[in-house]
Amino acid sequence: MNQANACWGVYREQAHSPNRVDDDAAIMMRVGEAMAERGFSVNLVTSDAVLGAACVNVFAMCERGPILDCLGTMEKAGAVVVNASAAIRNTYRHRMTELFAQHHVSAPVSHIVATDANKPRLADRLWVKRYDFHATQSDDVIYAASESGWRDALRRFAARGIPFVVAQEHVEGDLVKFYGVRGAAAADDAKWFEWFYHRDKGMLGHRFDVARLRQAALAAAAALGLEIFGGDAVIQANGEAAVIDLNAWPSYALYRDRAAQTIADHLTERFERRSRLAPSTRS
């Protein structure tokens, strides 16, 4: 096995995988197996192993800021990291909110609000979410359908030392989940896309064009710079999809084997292209 093809896969931190630790680990292991089948020497590690590590190509599920800083240093030294450290950081909710607005992504109206602000409710129904990470516990997302509910949500976040929230206006419709893999260059370069209805939610049965959902999801991923992504969208009565959440590297639980092969093909292309472009180290 060619050690020049060495790469690391970095697991997501368990605190960032509520009720998904096994599923998140499973997709990483399956991608690692698929990369080994393609001739790579793969080392699957926890995020703490990245601290102070040498420069190596990486596929990463991790989310903590200090780990992303280390991955960013590797990138500056010439390593390929997928998803890029900046793209992973862009999934922090306050960044996502700003980037979705800048790139006109089809998404609910969202507001960044200080938890100590004496601010009246911004809409009749709101999803109040911590401003940085995706949910690590049930209280990281609170539904507020009244003024008292809104103020209680702010108090609860403030009591936990969380200084800001994203208040996302509720959108009525059918909840769907989607998974994708896209190229790093063009916004619409979809290598694979799949969707399904959320099994735990009631259905209104709104008709829609899957191509429009795909377009909205890819635009959202491109806005954040994600290549490997998944998320949630609401299909509205007019058939339009509103992206309500986007994650870097989901568990792909229903499509793990297919996703792993597509991801491995994508990683192989990314890692080998960088190897071809890198300047020779021979004297």
Regions found by a protein language model. Give the residues of each.
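Flexible, charged surface loops at secondary-structure boundaries
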Residues: 1-5, 49-56, 75-76, 119-123, ...
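Conserved N-proximal alpha/beta basic substrate-recognition cap immediately N-terminal to
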Residues: 8-114, 134
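C-terminal active-site "lid" helix and adjoining low-complexity regulatory extension at the edge
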Residues: 31-33, 208, 222, 226, ...
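A short glycine-rich, hydrophobically flanked beta-strand micro-motif that places a catalytic Asp/Glu
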Residues: 44-47, 165-168, 176, 226-238
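A short beta-strand motif that forms the metal-chelation/ATP-contact edge
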Residues: 55-60, 126-129, 178-180, 239-254
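ATP-grasp fold ATP-binding core
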Residues: 100, 121-139, 162-172
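Rossmann-like NAD(P)H-binding beta-loop-alpha module
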Residues: 108-126
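Phosphate-binding site of ATP-dependent enzymes
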Residues: 142-224
